[in-house]
Amino acid sequence: MSEIILTPKEQPEVPLEAPNIKPDVFAGKSIDEIKNIQIMHGNEVVKLGDFFEVSGEPADAPEDIKIIIDGDVYNTKRIGQEMTAGEIIVRGNVNMYVGAGMKGGKITVEGNAGSWAGQDMRGGEIEILGDADDYVGSSYRGDWRGMSGGTITVHGNADNEIGEYMNGGKIIIKGDVNIMPGIHMNNGLIIIEGNVVARAGGEMAGGTIVVKGMMQEFLAGFKYLGVEKDIELMVKNSPGAFYKFEGDHAIKGAKGIVYAAVGCNGHIAP
């Protein structure tokens, strides 16, 4: 796989909008042509080479390209938006909308990610080694269709409303989550290995949420179905005993499932 290395020259005060940083756009271009790719700096159209040193070996096909962003880009948005193939590695933090609308390939963020990581994601893989802000795998504002495919893994903590309006795919949070994971969820799988502050699965109609830590508060619209052991979800086993709930019955005909680890959640047991 050919590697193209982007080294940030500076951190702009006004954020960059860079949906063209993806293998699909870099494919078939020379290094000089890649430097001339357009991105947005506020309301100005600028060149990628104005803000990044560019080096490496180009390739003709997106699946043969690995883009390495060698440094922090905490003020650059939309990296990897709608990418279909290839790989992006960010050696630092990244701003909002990383991998939004992604259809294939892989993005690895070695630091933290801003809000809306994997928004409306349809395929591929996003791995965030640090923390993620709000709305991981969510919908666009005003839309009712969120992430529908692919996998997002966050090795740290995530903030509010992950998987909002989720329609498919899988989100794995290795740490803790704040409020309302899986709000308005319709399908897919969310696995939270840490704790949840409150309101998991609010107004969910379908899909599955697994909480291996403690849920500090739980909603009244869920029906207790009993205890299950060693549940198996989308190939991966989750060993141990779990309380099983169906809901949120604030929504007519809701069939969502929430599993909560027995060892951490005696306070919500009937």
UniProtKB/Swiss-Prot annotation:
Keywords for this protein: Methanogenesis, Oxidoreductase, Repeat
Highest rank taxon of the organism = Archaea
Biological process (GO) annotations held by this record are: methanogenesis, from carbon dioxide
**Which segments cross the bilayer?**
none
In the induction comment, the record states: By growth on tungsten or molybdenum under anaerobic conditions.
Keyword Aminoacyl-tRNA synthetase belongs to the record: no
One example of the protein's molecular function in GO is: formylmethanofuran dehydrogenase activity
Q: What class of enzyme is it?
A: oxidoreductase
Q: Which reaction does it catalyse?
A: N-formylmethanofuran + 2 oxidized [2Fe-2S]-[ferredoxin] + H2O = methanofuran + 2 reduced [2Fe-2S]-[ferredoxin] + CO2 + H(+)
InterPro entries in the record, alphabetically?
Answer: FMH_DH_FwdC (IPR054942), Formylmethanofuran_DH_suC (IPR017550), Glu_synth_asu_C_sf (IPR036485)
Gene3D superfamilies, alphabetically?
Glutamate synthase, alpha subunit, C-terminal domain (2.160.20.60)
Record CDD domains: FwdC/FmdC (cd00980)
Q: Which SUPFAM superfamilies does the entry link to?
A: Alpha subunit of glutamate synthase, C-terminal domain (SSF69336)
In residue numbers, the region (7 X 13 AA repeats of [GW]-X-X-M-X-X-G-X-[IL]-X-[IV]-X-G) covers 80-213
Q: What is its EC number?
A: 1.2.7.12
Residue stretches of each sequence repeat: 80-92, 99-111, 118-130, 144-156, 163-175, 182-194, 201-213
Pathway listed:
One-carbon metabolism; methanogenesis from CO(2); 5,10-methenyl-5,6,7,8-tetrahydromethanopterin from CO(2): step 1/3
Q: What exactly does this protein do?
A: Catalyzes the reversible oxidation of CO(2) and methanofuran (MFR) to N-formylmethanofuran (CHO-MFR). This enzyme is oxygen-labile.
The entry assigns this protein to a family as follows: Belongs to the FwdC/FmdC family.
**What does the subunit comment say?**
This enzyme is composed of six subunits FwdA, FwdB, FwdC, FwdD, FwdF and FwdG.
Q: Which NCBIfam families does the record associate with it?
A: FMH_DH_FwdC (NF042910), one_C_dehyd_C (TIGR03122)
Protein name per its UniProtKB record = Tungsten-containing formylmethanofuran dehydrogenase 2 subunit C
- What is the originating organism of this protein? Methanothermobacter wolfeii (Methanobacterium wolfei)
User: The organism's lineage?
Assistant: Archaea, Methanobacteriati, Methanobacteriota, Methanomada group, Methanobacteria
